[in-house]
Amino acid sequence: MIAMLRTYATFTSSLPDDQQEKDGEIVIPGGRNILGRLHDGLARRGFSVSEIKQHEDYGWCFEIVAPSCRIWCLIQFCEPWLLITDRCGGLLKRLLGVSDDSTHRKVCETFQDIIAEDSSFSELRWFTKAEFEETKGQGGHDKPVK
């Protein structure tokens, strides 16, 4: 049986809100400090991570660079926080039917560990993209891998 990878995670955080507004408009989205905590946790565990960048006007992102692919990571607030991971690269292998999601799985499992070990995070739930869209982030699963 092939393991199903859940790449969307929702969770709450007690870290301070770092969103900045001007004249009632968001000028800098919140979540930079939260993604920074996750980013640093991955780096401490040996992952090669890019710098964190603002993603459009609603979130923050960075990439994990591995030999076989890149994993793009985004956080945005959708009550609660939403973490999305997406595998980039390795298109030729996937077209040839050789799909290795082991790096992506390891990243999601490491996010699971980082969030579980940090008392400023709680209520972690995992979803596939389809599950998240269908349930609007309600329910979910305890682990990123089925």
What are the residue ranges of the model-derived segments?
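A short linear-motif detector with a strong N-terminal bias
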Residues: I28, D40-A43, E51-K53, C61-I64, ...
